[in-house]
Amino acid sequence: MSQGTIVQCIGAVVDIQFPREAMPKVYDALKLENAAGSFAEEGLTFEVQQQLGDGVVRTIAMGSSDGLRRGMKVASTGKGISIPVGHGTLGRIMDVLGRPIDEAGPIEADELRPIHAKAPKFDELSPSVDLLETGIKVIDLVCPFAKGGKVGLFGGAGVGKTVNMMELINNIAKQHSGLSVFAGVGERTREGNDFYHEMKDSNVLDKVAMVFGQMNEPPGNRLRVALTGLTMAERFRDEGRDILFFVDNIYRYTLAGTEVSALLGRMPSAVGYQPTLAEEMGRLQERITSTKVGSITSIQAVYVPADDLTDPSPATTFLHLDSTVVLSRDIAALGIYPAVDPLDSTSRQLDPLVVGEEHYNVARQVQVTLQRYKELRDIIAILGMDELSPEDKLAVSRARKIQRFLSQPFHVAEVFTGSPGKYVPLKDTINGFKMIVNGECDHLPEQAFYMVGGIEEAMEKAKKLQ
């Protein structure tokens, strides 16, 4: 175990000098000497980012750098950051270094795995076309998820990314008998606490492993915490299991990379992001994949800065996803939740060969009707409904019913709305929208379709309104 001394501290970036012949490798973990003169596991950890030459390495502190000073002793562990994986992590909350933060004693791990690993080889990958039912109408209809696929929830501030993710966890993780891993990357600590209690109250805590590196953590922690969660998910996948991997929020991962890049003195690229943005994103996303042994289905929340989907961070994330669920501020302003934009959201699974002719045709008819309404909105605003042709009046009437029928009460929002959450099976979703586009519901008032589950519930509500 080679030892070095701190020669410079600039915030989270620390330069450490080692003997020339014993310089640590890039991504090696280093430990700080404690007051007792030992290099304890719970002490401050550094990760090597650059070798500057002459025995000096530039590192990022994986914790607060308060109290560091020049001349302090640091030891190389000779390997990268390794974390406990396996069944001992289920029901536990860990930090980026795999240390428990739930005050429930040490974690009994099957093994320790390094967080830096190569993506599976091309011949080990396994494509998947099986659909994953979510019980959320708008998602199942226009942007269906694939088992073993990658899904992104895109949205600006306050349009419901985390609530949608919590509902997906509620509907999938509880129905799905497999295991889940949740990585909280740079988000609010309160949300992590809510998530933990939600899982505990639902009695599924023993099927979930959680890792958090929240907003108050240094950039090194936020940059690596997604890899920690992914390493845990990979271990379960390699056992032949189907894993759900939730990440909230991928944008904070990018942002932490930007902070680290600036601290390391790299020249920024477009909009101030790090020059290695595409490579860093690819390194994470290429590992989130399904092999012939097991699958990882990943659902990632992606914050969209200033609601601009062309921003380099969300734009780079788009490339890696199978389904994109775009949350719209305009739809949220109408009071329609989930505020998913059915015209902007896409999925590779929405193909007649995968979902079947009926599902595909209904979804496309819904989109065509909503698109026609969008085109007519300006005319309606200027001239009013009376100036439209009978066909257009009918299209607008159906579109407004579809728009309201795309809303749905959530289980996780019951405490705020007072209305019980609804899980809608896929066949009921297709049947409901098919009836609306075919004109079988033209006689019903549009208010009857707002915040209901299936079409039968809308009909019951219509009877009460009449």
Curated annotation (Swiss-Prot):
Its Enzyme Commission number? Answer: 7.1.2.2
Q: Which GO terms describe its cellular component?
A: plasma membrane; proton-transporting ATP synthase complex
Which residues of this UniProt protein bind ATP? G155, G156, A157, G158, V159, G160, K161, T162
Where in or outside the cell it occurs: the entry states:
Cell inner membrane
What are the recorded GO MF terms, alphabetically?
A: ATP binding; ATP hydrolysis activity; proton-transporting ATP synthase activity, rotational mechanism
- Does the record carry DNA-binding as a key word? no
The record's section on Gene3D superfamilies has: 2.40.10.170, Bovine Mitochondrial F1-atpase, Atp Synthase Beta Chain, Chain D, domain 3, P-loop containing nucleotide triphosphate hydrolases
Q: Which UniProt keywords apply?
A: ATP synthesis, ATP-binding, Cell inner membrane, Cell membrane, CF(1), Hydrogen ion transport, Ion transport, Membrane, Nucleotide-binding, Translocase, Transport
What HAMAP family does the record tag this protein with? ATP_synth_beta_bact
Q: How does it assemble?
A: F-type ATPases have 2 components, CF(1) - the catalytic core - and CF(0) - the membrane proton channel. CF(1) has five subunits: alpha(3), beta(3), gamma(1), delta(1), epsilon(1). CF(0) has three main subunits: a(1), b(2) and c(9-12). The alpha and beta chains form an alternating ring which encloses part of the gamma chain. CF(1) is attached to CF(0) by a central stalk formed by the gamma and epsilon chains, while a peripheral stalk is formed by the delta and b chains.
Relate the protein's function as given in its record. Answer: Produces ATP from ADP in the presence of a proton gradient across the membrane. The catalytic sites are hosted primarily by the beta subunits.
Q: What is this protein called?
A: ATP synthase subunit beta
The gene behind this protein is atpD
